[in-house]
From Swiss-Prot:
PROSITE patterns: UBIH. GO terms for biological process: ubiquinone biosynthetic process. GO terms for molecular function: FAD binding; monooxygenase activity; oxidoreductase activity, acting on paired donors, with incorporation or reduction of molecular oxygen. The keyword Oxidoreductase applies. This is Uncharacterized protein slr1300. Its cofactor is FAD. It comes from the Bacteria. Keywords: FAD, Flavoprotein, Monooxygenase, Oxidoreductase. The lineage of its organism: Bacteria, Bacillati, Cyanobacteriota, Cyanophyceae, Synechococcales. SUPFAM superfamilies: FAD/NAD(P)-binding domain.
Length: 414
């Protein structure tokens, strides 16, 4: 049986995406040239979604995917780019420097504020007449048909029913769609929370990112345009709750004690945000006519800024699997096809989840052998170029299978 795209005159869709955030829109944008009819179901009004005061580390691979989607040119002048990374540890006197030359790239990574990247992706998908938005709308339930899922939404007090050959959960770590599907997760909550905020500073150089490890948790400093920096400060829950509620002057004093004078004079330019840290992996990423992407499938420790990047890779990989199946006349919602996505992404995500968990535990340990071992490890990274390059390729996404979108090729069904 050959599966063809749905007509554009009814509530029948080829792909319905629950969640119109960055990951869901990467998937939709990746499919926009395939001829498939796509529904995006988003609970937040557009104005509210675009006010999220958050910034993300964007890896080299994610940047290449965004370029393949055609949105990079629209955001590259509005985001931060870092050419160097300095890694340091409380129990190590020096720093381990990484540079763009270590991977022969123009930068080591990028930093994008949520409204910038989300608006660019929204503009991209809104140009496609075969993509329909249901917003604000909530997915209430879904049932399985022979070759489709029937999805019930609530929008403006009324219920709407859609049919789709594939439902994709891109609705975050507390995914309602995943819960309705009965998919269990494994993982744990860390003993830490993160305090995230943005500062304005006077450092002469704004092209260096910093990752500072200590026994209470890591701190990441990421450069933003306009002499700004996004800081994610990880620490035990009680300390994080105390810091987020300190008067601003006292908070600045605590921060200066941690980062020293590397950024010169600085001040806060937005509110401090507190969020807990967890590791989570779904037992499965797919069921017949259902797939999970992004935080709906997995969550990791924020050290290294990997979370959103894993989701962007999920979206690009699933788009490729769907487009390939469609071009070959296969049922892109079948379990056999969707397993190709799971077999691609789940092991790679496990690798990063395990690596970030190891980093946090290893650099937080007071055990003397662990302290000695991490000193040795940092020396190896500093002095052995192949080890440095391998670590960089892992954290920038350049190690492993790359989605077609990352090569600059659009996904077009034949």
């Amino acid at each position: 049986m050959t599966f063809v795209a749905a007509s554009i005159t009814d509530n029948q869709f080829d792909v319905a995406i629950a969640g119109g955030g960055v990951v869901g829109l990467v998937l939709a944008a990746g499919l926009r040239h395939t001829g498939l009819k796509i529904a995006i179901i988003e609970a937040l009004p557009k104005e509210q979604a675009l006010t999220k005061p958050q910034a993300y580390a964007i890896s080299l691979l994610s940047g290449k995917i965004l370029a393949g989607l055609g949105v990079w040119e629209n955001i590259k002048d509005s985001i931060g780019h870092f050419e160097r990374i300095q890694i340091s540890d409380n129990d190590y006197r020096g720093t381990v420097p990484f540079a763009k030359e270590d991977v022969d790239e123009l930068a080591l990574g990028h930093v994008a504020e949520h409204p910038v990247i989300l608006q660019a992706l929204e503009n991209c998908v809104e140009q496609c007449p075969r993509i329909a938005w249901f917003r604000p709308a909530e997915l209430i339930s879904f049932t399985a048909g022979e070759n489709h899922k029937q999805v019930t939404l609530q929008q403006e007090g009324r219920e709407i029913t859609l049919q789709t050959k594939l439902l994709v959960a891109a609705d975050g770590a507390r995914s309602h769609t995943r819960s309705l599907a009965g998919i269990q997760t494994k993982g744990w909550k860390y003993w830490q929370s993160c305090v995230a905020f943005t500062i304005q500073h006077q450092a002469p150089d704004n092209t260096t990112a910093f990752e500072r490890f200590c026994d209470t948790g890591p701190m990441g400093i990421l450069p933003l345009p306009g002499d700004r920096a996004q800081i994610v400060w990880t620490m035990p829950h009680h300390k994080a709750h105390t810091l987020v509620n300190l008067p601003e002057a006292d908070f600045i004093t605590e921060l200066r004690q941690r980062i020293g004078d590397r950024l010169g004079e600085f001040h806060l330019i937005n509110a401090r945000r507190l969020f807990p840290v967890q590791l989570m992996q779904s037992d499965c990423y797919v069921q017949p006519r259902l797939a999970l992407v992004g935080d709906a499938a997995h969550c990791c420790h924020p050290v290294g800024g990997q979370g959103l990047n894993l989701g962007i890779r999920d979206g690009a990989a699933l788009a490729q699997v769907i487009a390939t199946a469609h071009s070959q006349g296969e049922d892109w919602g079948s379990l056999a096809v969707l397993k190709r996505y799971e077999h691609w992404r789940k092991p790679e995500n496990w690798l990063i989840l395990g690596f970030t968990d190891l980093l946090d535990r290893f650099f937080s340990s007071h055990w003397l052998p662990a302290i000695a071992l991490r000193r040795f490890g940092l020396e190896v990274l500093r002095l052995v170029p192949p080890a440095k390059k391998l670590a960089l390729r892992l954290m920038t996404g350049l190690l492993g299978r790359k989605p077609q979108l990352a090569t600059g090729q659009s996904l077009v069904s034949q």
